[in-house]
């Protein structure tokens, strides 16, 4: 089953290579890597071009914000699931995707543990999550895989500058 990993970035020369290497070093083979750049001018594109043989699709053009870039990434994705591994983010090791997707999955959303500067972010254990949970904790993009069909059906609200992802999850 194909997984689409989408990186959105803008002027991320200091962190983009770590993200790219994290994605392309995954041992799971059916990965489509997409990079949506907002028109970087700092050398980010030189790094992207260095790895373009590993990238299924990349584009560099101005966008109207992060949610516009994320929606654009979903538009080009062909995988069953999408994950956003934005510039500066990385998988904890090279077996993350293999550990998740070796067995056939059919959940609409898969969320795992994420290491963040404050410690660890843990996904909810419940199948039915309350609205209160979203306002308190939310979901961590880097540790969440969402069926592409859902992302196409319910795109991020590009009029919002923050929290459009919260609205999506609700």
Where in this protein do the model-derived segments appear?
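A conserved acidic beta->alpha catalytic loop
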Residues: 37-46, 86
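N-proximal low-complexity "stem/linker" segments adjacent to membrane-targeting elements
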Residues: 1-25
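Conserved donor NDP-sugar-binding/catalytic core segment of glycosyltransferases
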Residues: 90, 94-124
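Acidic helix N-cap motif at the loop->helix transition within catalytic regions
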Residues: 14-17, 42-50
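Short beta-strand/loop segment that forms part of the nucleotide-sugar
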Residues: 30-39, 59-62
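Glycine-rich, basic loop-to-helix element that forms the pyrophosphate-binding segment
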Residues: 60-77
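Short aromatic/hydrophobic "clamp" motif used to bind/position activated sugar donors
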Residues: 82
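Conserved nucleotide-sugar donor-binding catalytic segment
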Residues: 112, 122-170
């Amino acid at each position: 089953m194909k997984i689409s990993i989408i990186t959105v970035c803008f002027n991320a020369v200091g962190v983009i290579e770590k993200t790219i290497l994290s994605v392309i070093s995954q041992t799971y083979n059916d990965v489509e890597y997409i990079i949506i750049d907002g028109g970087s001018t700092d050398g980010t594109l030189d790094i992207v071009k260095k790895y373009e043989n590993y990238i299924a699709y990349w584009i560099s053009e101005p966008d109207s914000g992060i949610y516009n870039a994320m929606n654009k990434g979903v538009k080009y994705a062909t995988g069953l699931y999408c994950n956003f591994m934005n510039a500066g983010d990385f998988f904890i090791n090279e077996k993350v995707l293999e550990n998740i997707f070796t067995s056939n999955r059919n959940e609409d959303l898969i969320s795992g543990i994420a290491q963040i500067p404050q410690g660890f972010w843990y996904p909810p254990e419940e199948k039915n999550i309350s609205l209160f949970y979203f306002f308190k904790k939310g979901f961590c993009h880097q540790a969440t895989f969402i069926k592409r069909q859902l992302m196409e059906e319910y795109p991020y609200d590009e009029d919002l500058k923050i929290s459009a992802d919260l609205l999506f999850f609700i």
